[in-house]
Amino acid sequence: MDDLAGAAPENWYPRKTGMNPEATINDDRRFGGVTRLYGSDGAASLRRARICVVGIGGVGSWALEALARTGVGYLTAVDLDMVAESNTNRQIHALDDVYGKAKVEAMAERIAHINPACRVNCIEDFVTPENAANILDDGYDVVIDAIDQVRAKV
């Protein structure tokens, strides 16, 4: 697997998992389907990709997890909201043990169990017309707009 180390913003989530730290993760097994589908070069491109998902709700939470399961190496999650019980019917992170937790933090913890090599940058903020350029100008390959507030659409 490509080396994912390097300069990372200070707010990149420190990965915590319940996995045995002595355990070896076999990325060929874990992401072999991605390599078979997209080829070695495609899988390597995904490992190097920097993708930002803005809005970690009913669309964004599913998109963020799908990207992690595809082997994307760098993800940024942007949302200021907390996981609520009323999110359970539509948001992948809405589980009993995460109600009240920041959505971005809940997703970072979930992703650490799916793709431990993935670096997750958590930005606890809403995107507004005033801060959009600052949040979105970080060299992302792709930005996914999953915002539910029309005023914040950029």
Name these PLM-found stretches:
Residues D2-C52:
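N-terminal charged helix/coil linker that caps or initiates catalytic domains
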Residues D28, R36, S40, G57, ...:
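Electropositive phosphate-/nucleotide-binding environments in soluble metabolic enzymes
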Residues L37-D41, L64, T128-N134:
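A generic local structural motif
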Residues R47-A68, Y74-D79, A84:
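Glycine-rich adenosine-cofactor-binding loop
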Residues A66-R69, R90-H93, I135-D138:
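Short, glycine/charged-enriched secondary-structure capping and boundary segments
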Residues Y74-N115:
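Glycine-rich phosphate-binding loop and adjoining beta1-alpha1-beta2 segment
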Residues G100-V142, I147-K153:
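A structured beta-alpha segment of the ubiquitous adenosine-cofactor-binding alpha/beta core
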